[in-house]
């Protein structure tokens, strides 16, 4: 594909299993505008485990050196996109810079010269989005950037999201989202950045249930320090529980928590960010900012007296590693003490199920409290005539229990 793709408003495109959409990395026109996949109508990507849909670049360009090269734009669901399904789909090598001539700049979604494309963008507060069983990897910017809509984000693998900033999942005002059962490996900053930034009379409070996710190696690659697994701010109602953080730089942060319920300041004080499990390896990071926190080990970051830790409120019941008790989750196949904290290449041989006797199998929240029930577990979300349900809460930490 050497030109921009647009699904027109009022139309839909179905991409069947096994289809590969290969983007030209040279861009469009004399300005080399990164190729963008614009969804003004509806998009249904219907891959299978055996035959996923693929959005990528030419095979010879799928290299480690190009992990953050931003070889094409990304999928941009505009404010006229009513619904989108991304199931069993691989999206990789995205993150081209938004420039003059980029459709997203012309449409006012992003600003030319200031933004890079996430893998997936949404921008319709009335939209419905289901992103499941997919792989979002190797991108300059965020994996998913939600600026509107109802969404289920479940059972996905995120890897190497963000070159010098960015998150796996980034939520803004106008969204109601369940984020569950995902693996998030080496997001540049956070696995979850949750904010009600942009809230207005028409764009409502961001509401997020984030549970049973496994976040690994978050925060270490960032140029400077800002978060390191979960970051909740600006009046977001965020219930973040039963997640497993492994070798992340910091614990959950809630900046400006002394000024809650303010779209310009702190998160909603009705949020529950607790009952999480913070595991650490013994290895030292090869990137340490001595002039900032000086944190060089995951356990040190978890126990650092950070100004954005809302002590006594956040993580009161969480299980937190220390230097002398690293809380090894006992994964089936992941060397928690060996994989470099700044590693971003995902090994398909890893297995984040846990072995019998793993400490992540005890101490989690039952999830039965009314305020912790997923938004779309009962009635679900209807996309293309099919009802999709969020996963039920599991009384364990992380995405996977016993194999």
Put a short name on every predicted segment.
Residues 1-8, 12-16, 24-41, 48, ...:
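Extracellular beta-rich repeat passengers
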């Amino acid at each position: 594909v050497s030109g921009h793709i647009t699904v027109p408003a009022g139309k839909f495109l179905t991409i069947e299993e096994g289809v590969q959409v290969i983007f030209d990395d040279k861009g469009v026109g004399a300005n080399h505008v990164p190729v963008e996949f614009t969804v003004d109508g509806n998009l249904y990507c219907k891959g299978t485990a055996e035959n996923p849909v693929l959005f990528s670049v030419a095979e010879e360009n799928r290299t480690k050196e190009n992990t953050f090269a931003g070889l094409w734009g990304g999928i941009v669901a505009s404010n006229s996109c009513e619904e989108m399904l991304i199931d069993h789909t691989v999206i990789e090598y995205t993150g081209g810079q938004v420039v003059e001539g980029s459709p997203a700049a012309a449409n006012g979604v992003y600003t030319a010269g200031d933004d890079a494309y996430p893998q997936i963008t949404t921008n319709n507060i009335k939209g419905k989005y289901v992103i499941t069983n997919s792989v979002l990897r190797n991108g300059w910017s965020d994996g998913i950037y939600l600026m509107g809509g109802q969404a289920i984000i479940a059972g996905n693998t995120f890897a190497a999201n963000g070159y010098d900033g960015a998150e796996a999942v980034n939520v803004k005002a106008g969204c109601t989202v369940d984020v569950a059962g995902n693996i998030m490996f080496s997001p540049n900053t956070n696995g979850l950045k949750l904010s009600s930034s942009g809230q207005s009379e028409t764009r409502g409070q961001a509401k997020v249930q984030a549970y049973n996710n496994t976040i690994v190696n978050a925060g270490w690659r960032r140029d400077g320090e800002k978060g390191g697994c979960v970051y909740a701010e600006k009046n977001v109602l965020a219930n973040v529980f039963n997640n497993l953080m492994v070798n992340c730089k910091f614990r959950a942060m809630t900046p400006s928590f002394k000024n809650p319920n303010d779209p310009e300041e702190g998160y909603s004080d009705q949020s529950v960010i607790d009952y999480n499990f913070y595991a650490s390896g013994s290895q030292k990071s090869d990137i340490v900012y001595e002039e900032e926190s000086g944190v060089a080990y995951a356990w040190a970051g978890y126990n650092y007296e950070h100004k954005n830790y809302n002590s006594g409120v956040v993580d009161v019941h969480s299980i937190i590693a220390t230097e002398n008790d690293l809380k090894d989750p006992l994964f089936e196949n992941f060397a928690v003490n060996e994989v470099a904290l700044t590693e971003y290449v995902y090994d398909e041989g890893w297995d984040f199920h846990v072995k019998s006797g793993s400490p992540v199998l005890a101490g989690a929240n039952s999830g039965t409290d009314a305020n912790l029930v997923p938004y779309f577990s009962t009635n679900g979300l209807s996309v293309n005539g099919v009802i999709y349900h969020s996963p039920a809460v599991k009384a364990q930490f992380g995405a996977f229990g016993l194999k």
